[in-house]
Amino acid sequence: MVYQLVPFQKRAFQNGSFQNCVVSLLSGGALFSFLLSIFFVLFLLTPVRAGELPKFFTYLKAVDPSILQEMRYYGSHNFLGRRVKGYKAAECILTMPAARALKKVQKRLRPKGLSLKVYDCYRPQRAVNDFIAWAKKPTDIKTKAEFYPTLKKSKLFGLGYIARRSTHSRGSTVDLTIVPLPPKTQPEHNPSKQTACFEEVDSRYKDNSLDFGTGYDCFHEKSHTKSRVVLDARKNRDLLV
């Protein structure tokens, strides 16, 4: 599902698991987008001291430390099976408006005993390039059993599960889910015991989020917005949107 802050609009979900809820900043229309693109080029070319962020960017924990973080691409539990290039820390970095928007959602969820959990936020272009390079290696299928068991790697871009240009690289997009509080301890991921991400909740990897019908980054039709999922998963999807 795609959320655009200004104006608000919903579109059909096209890439990855339904848990990938995308927040994009479109204030000011095309001119703003053009200027923001220029800013990101300068951001990538300008040296920044360790721990220092460019203006208009923030660590999510500085805006709302109660939002849980599980930065999948910094670790190995992702469809590459290793840390993705460009990720230097397990930190969610966003534009300030996007971070504040998440804080507002979190404020509504907490009284219900729920919390947001983010999986990915700002995504360096190096990471996108890493995805592209990975897709060109047909023999590297060590994560296929969990993340894309019914598809060939060569189909992932054409079907929209992975994008060659990611809105994450603008810092205004976030992959997230909803977790019951207090959060349960997740089992350590064992790559030698993979189960398909579209299996029933008791069979696939036991993420501590609500059941949305699939695991995170599930490249399968069951992750599509209008796919048929069990009633509880459908209710959770409705809550997320």
Language-model features: locations:
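Bacterial N-terminal signal peptides
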Residues: 28-44
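Residue-identity detector for glycine
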Residues: 16, 28-29, 51
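Extracytoplasmic cell-surface/polysaccharide-interacting catalytic and binding patches
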Residues: 47-121, 128-241
